[in-house]
């Protein structure tokens, strides 16, 4: 029988062993467990809302009124007013008839793909989609096909092949992200939507890293391109730019009713705490307000500045510095930490083998001197 120590030793030899880093706050200026001040360039709190006074107050007020937990699953007695209010707000914000929230983004993907797909269906997915989407597709029982990253020709070939092959009642689903989590680049969304419509398929778009950052009201890339009405299933997270926790799917009333009845992570989990829902609602309201515009402007100023310094085209708040070798990425991360910058090494299986990197993420909370200082330190490690 395999012993856990043997597996851990193998991970260590391959430079893939991970451990938890304790003693950190989620603010942009934080302390390591050794008490050394560092600037966080690894957080997905893109607008700095997770410590915003308004969100904290909303969470505290909801806790005082509803308690610390929901006490049951949503379909039993755990569906509280903050959950309803949040879902109605998400639907309004995303331009859909309805929305359903989950405890986190992983549960959202597992629930949606498991609810909507079964044996006989086909799901076609971008190679760089997040693990939650891949896992959800694999567990659904549907046929999973992967197309090379953002390769429209291969996508069309697969759509054409399976549209002819599957039965009339089977579903043909395309899955992609608007902003990819490890590379920070965008999907050619308009072209993908055209192909989905051409072959009478469905599109599930994960906007996890676009919500709050793109779009006139922070709704994401679909809204920025005027495509919301043409996308059946819009998925997102509440734990990144929104500043809280959880995930959601926004769609037609029929899709959401089906999800409510068939999504196992939703049915068999205690509802998220009411404080989480209240903070999420507050975060969305801020993102959609004039203050949200100001925060996005500050964020994009930081994105543009670091992109310019690194000679890259600004696309999102995620800027990878690809080093290739695991040990090289670990050493680079350790060197940056010594200089006061937190940018953990990202390695396989999060990214493909041979593409270990520093995944730099920017926030509206970063000051320009920190961005410039990070760049100077990167010159010595990359």
Where are these regions (language model features)?
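N-terminal "arm"/small-domain region of PLP-dependent enzymes with the aminotransferase-like
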Residues: 2-68, 201
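PLP-dependent enzyme catalytic core of the Aspartate aminotransferase-like
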Residues: 53, 57, 61, 65, ...
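Conserved PLP-anchoring active-site segment centered on the Schiff-base-forming lysine
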Residues: 112-131, 302
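Conserved PLP-binding catalytic core of the aspartate aminotransferase-like
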Residues: 293-340, 350, 354-355, 362-364
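Conserved N-terminal alpha-helix of the aminotransferase class I/II PLP-enzyme fold
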Residues: 57, 61-104
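Conserved active-site segment immediately N-terminal to the catalytic lysine
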Residues: 200, 219-238, 256-261
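PLP-dependent aminotransferase class I/II
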Residues: 235-237, 241-313
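Active-site phosphate-binding strand-loop segment of PLP-dependent enzymes
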Residues: 45, 145, 149-205
């Amino acid at each position: 029988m395999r012993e856990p120590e043997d597996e851990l030793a193998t991970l260590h030899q391959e430079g893939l062993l991970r451990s938890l880093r304790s003693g950190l706050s989620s603010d942009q200026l934080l302390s390591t467990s050794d008490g050394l001040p560092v600037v966080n360039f690894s957080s997905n709190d893109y607008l700095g809302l997770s410590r915003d006074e308004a969100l904290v107050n909303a969470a505290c007020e909801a806790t005082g009124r509803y308690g610390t937990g929901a006490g049951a699953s949503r379909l039993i007695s755990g569906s509280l007013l903050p959950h309803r209010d949040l879902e109605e707000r998400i639907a309004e914000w995303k331009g859909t008839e309805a929305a359903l929230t989950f405890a986190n983004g992983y549960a959202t993907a597992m629930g949606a793909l498991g609810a909507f797909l079964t044996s006989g269906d086909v799901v076609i997915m971008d190679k760089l989609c997040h693990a939650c989407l891949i896992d959800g597709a694999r567990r659904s029982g549907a046929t999973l096909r992967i197309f090379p990253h953002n390769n429209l020709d291969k996508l069309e070939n697969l759509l054409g092949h399976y549209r002819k092959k599957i039965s009339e009642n089977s579903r043909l689903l395309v899955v992609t992200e608007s902003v990819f989590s490890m590379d920070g680049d965008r999907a050619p969304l308009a072209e993908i939507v055209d192909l989905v419509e051409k072959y009478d398929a469905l599109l599930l778009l994960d906007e996890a890293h676009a919500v709050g950052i793109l779009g006139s009201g922070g709704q994401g890339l679909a809204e920025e391109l005027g495509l919301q009405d043409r996308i059946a299933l819009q998925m997102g997270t509440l734990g990144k730019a929104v500043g809280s926790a959880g995930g959601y799917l926004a769609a037609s009333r029929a899709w959401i009713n089906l999800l409510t009845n068939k999504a196992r992570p939703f049915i068999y989990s205690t509802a998220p705490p009411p404080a989480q829902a209240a903070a999420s609602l507050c975060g969305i309201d801020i993102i959609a307000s004039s203050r949200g515009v100001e925060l996005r402007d500050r964020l994009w100023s930081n994105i543009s500045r670091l992109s310019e310094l690194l000679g890259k085209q600004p696309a999102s708040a995620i800027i990878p510095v690809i080093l290739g070798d695991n040990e090289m990425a670990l050493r680079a991360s350790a060197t940056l930490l010594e200089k006061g910058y937190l940018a953990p090494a990202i390695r396989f299986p999060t990214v493909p083998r041979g593409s270990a990197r520093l995944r730099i993420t920017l926030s509206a909370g970063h000051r320009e001197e920190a961005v410039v200082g990070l760049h100077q330190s990167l010159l010595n490690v990359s």
